[in-house]
Amino acid sequence: MAMTLLEDWCRGMDVNSQRALLVWGIPVNCDETEIEETLQAAMPQVSYRVLGRMFWREENAKAALLELTGAVDYSLIPREMPGKGGLWKVVFKPPTSDAVFLERLHLFLAREGWTVQDVARVLGFQNPAPAPGPEMPAEMLNYILDNVIQPLVESIWYKKLTLFSGKDIPGPGEETFDSWLEHSNEIIEEWQVSDIEKRRRLMESLRGPAADVIRILKTNNAAITTAECLKALEQVFGSVESSRDAQVRFLNTYQNPGEKLSSYVIRLEPLLQKVVDKGVIDKDNVNQARLEQVIAGANHSGALRRQLWLAGAEEGPAPNLFQLLVQIREEEAKKEEEEAEAALLQLGLEGHF
C-alpha cells in the first residue's frame, strides 16, 4: 500500500520514484517544523528536499514525500525513525545494482572533489563523459563503464614499474638499466590506458638523473610519447655495445645444462633482436638465423635436434619464433611422457623382482 502511494505520488509530480522516499505514520498534529527536525535528526548525511505532505486516510496519519537531491548511500536511510507519536515508517524503491554502483561512484568522486568528466580528462579522453545518474540509459551506462570506470580502476590498481635512477651506484634493489627496460616494456604493454597515463606512470618509477632526462625532454616537447621516453633513456643509460660485440654474444650463447630447449630459445631472443637492431642480421633473415643458432647452441641430441636440422636444411622458409616454440614444446612434452612411462615401467619391474 505504501509503495503504491509512493509510485502514484511520484508519477503525479513527475519525480523519479527511485530518487524518492515516503515517510508515513506522522501524527496529524505534527507541524512542518517538527517534521523537518525529525527528518534531519534521522538522516543527517542524506541530502533531500520535501516535495509535499498529505493526510493518509487509511492510516489516519500524515505522509511526506521526499526527493533525494544528491548522491546517496542507501545504507544510511533508515526503515524507521523515532518521531513524535512513535516510530515513523520510511519506504523507498530498492535501487538496481547499476544505480547503487553509480551512486557509490558519485559519492567516491564527490568526497575526492572530482567529477566523472575530471576523471575522463585526466585519463586522456577527448570526448567529455556524461554525468552518471540512476536513470541513465543503458548505452550511456555502457559508455561510462567502458571509457571511464575501467580506466579509473586501471589507474588505481595497476602493476607498477620498479624504480630506476640512472645513478652510477644503483640504490638497494635497483636493477641494471637493460634488465629494468626489459621488465618495464612487458608491464607497459599490459596497461590498457592512454599514452599520457602510461607516461605518467613511467615518470613515477624514475628518480635522479633518469627523471631529469625525461623532464628536460618534456620541457622541449610536451607531447613526447612513452616510447620516445624509453628510447631516450636507452640512449643515455643503455649499455654501449658494438655491433660486433652483440653478434659475438649472440653466437656464443648456448643452452645451459638442465635448461629446456624452449627456455633457451626464449632467452636467446632478446640477443637476436639486439643484433637485428644493430643491422648485423637483416630482418628478412631473422628466422633462419634463430634456427641456426638454436641448432648450434643446443646441447640436446636425438630426434628433436635432427628435426631442427632438417628444418634448416629444407628449401622452404625457416619457422618463425612461435612455430619453432610450438614444435619444440610438443617434442618436450612427448619426451617427458616417454620418460614418465619408462619410470613407471622400471618401478613395475623392480616390484616384480
Curated annotation (Swiss-Prot):
Tissue expression, as annotated, is: Predominantly expressed in testis. Very low levels in the brain, including in the piriform cortex, hippocampus and some subcortical nuclei.
A GO cellular component annotated for this chain's UniProt record is: cytoplasm
> According to its UniProt record, where is this protein located?
Nucleus, Nucleolus
Keyword terms of this UniProt record: Nucleus
Protein origin, superkingdom: Eukaryota
A biological process term (GO) from this entry = inflammatory response to antigenic stimulus
Say where the protein is mainly found: nucleus
Q: Which Pfam families does UniProt cross-reference here?
A: PNMA, PNMA_N
Family named by the database record = Belongs to the PNMA family.
What is this protein's record name? Paraneoplastic antigen Ma1 homolog
Annotated organism of origin: Mus musculus (Mouse)
Lineage runs: Eukaryota, Metazoa, Chordata, Craniata, Vertebrata
